[in-house]
Amino acid sequence: SYGTAKETDDESGMKDFYDIRRDAKNGKCVLFFVSMQYLRLSKLIGGKKDDSQEKKDILNYDWDLVIIDEAHEGTQTDLGEGVINYLHKNGTFMLHLSGTPFNLLDKFKSEQIYNWDYIKEQQYKRQWDEDHKNKKASKSPSLFDAVDDEEEEVNPYRELPRMEILTFRLSEMTDAKAIKDAATGEFSFTEFFRVKTGHDVPKEERGKFLHEEQVLAFIKKLCQTSADSHYPFSNDDYRKCFRHTLWVVPGVKEAQALKKLLERTPLCTKLEFKVVNVAGNSEDDEQRGDALDKVLKAIGIDKKSGSDDSDQTRTITLSCGRLTTGVTVRPWTAVLYLKGSDTTAASTYMQTIFRVQSPHTINGMMKSKCYVFDFAPERALT
């Protein structure tokens, strides 16, 4: 068995570095969890004036294996490289993990790279059903499938939802074709969701959308009742499937304005969706944790007791970046991508859309599909 510990300022009650160092001296195998942000503070690698002895000892310790999760983040700076160089001793094995390693690939030889992606995952999922002649394999268009706990052999990939990407041209959904970016002459989310600001704007108008009528028309279009529509809230079946969605918008002011506008629409007044705004200007561990707790509470998930009432609630989470990487919100079944363009960084886009591909089972029903509603078709096709 392994002993585990975290950095001293962690409040989880786990052992600290010195506890597991003593365990290691006594022949016990140990695991130590520490954040890159914590180690980057050390003066040893050029960080802030932090002479913490613990940080020095962690960096100087002779580790057998160092695993860097989300290795595409914060490791390519001078401080990040300094941390890695200090941890990497002669004989230390290094494992870099990333779902979007685009900025790392040129630093490794081909034989050093192991790739397991969504396409392989879904291929193995289908192949397993074919090899085992699984007649119960899901062929239903439904987003949730019943779980059969009496199956003799269970597909090990069955909990991993298939992703569907649907594209729409927002400018054609409303009369927004005339709303164009001044520099490019093309439609842009930033202009569409532009918020009135400045001292020359009447106080009662500040914080409202400049093109409020068009934004409101867009929201109404999303939930306009229609049997053959593919908009996420256009019929009762879709509304049940998309109880909990993530909407990615251009910025903080835009998220604030959209929350106020949504709360005036039938999505909130009749369908009882609760809007949770987690958009913020900064992203540290504490703020991300607070935002996650805020979302889970609104959804009806209690982390302490493990209770899950997400099938009884409805939420829309608004973000301009927060909770779009390294976070799991299992009840999310769709993301509405309402920012950026075809030049959006691939890593940003992929990290965001795969927030909704997390496994989720509740009351015997398992999420078998998840959706991306992308309102910039050029992005999804490039």
Give the label of every model feature segment.
Residues 41-47, 70-83, 328-330, 348:
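Conserved ATPase-coupling elements of RecA-like P-loop NTPase cores
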Residues 106-246, 259:
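Interdomain helical connector at the RecA1-RecA2 junction of SF1/SF2 helicase-like NTPases
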Residues 62-63, 89-93, 160-163, 271-273, ...:
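Short glycine-/polar-rich loops that comprise or flank the Walker A/P-loop
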Residues 1-36, 43, 48, 52-58, ...:
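Conserved C-terminal RecA-like helicase domain
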Residues 73-75, 103-104, 344, 359:
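Catalytic P-loop NTPase motifs of RecA-like helicase/translocase cores
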Residues 33-38, 97-101, 251, 319-323, ...:
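A short beta-strand-to-loop transition that corresponds to the Sensor-1 phosphate-sensing loop
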Residues 277-382:
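Conserved RecA-like P-loop NTPase helicase motor core
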Residues 38, 54-96, 100:
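SF2 helicase catalytic motif II
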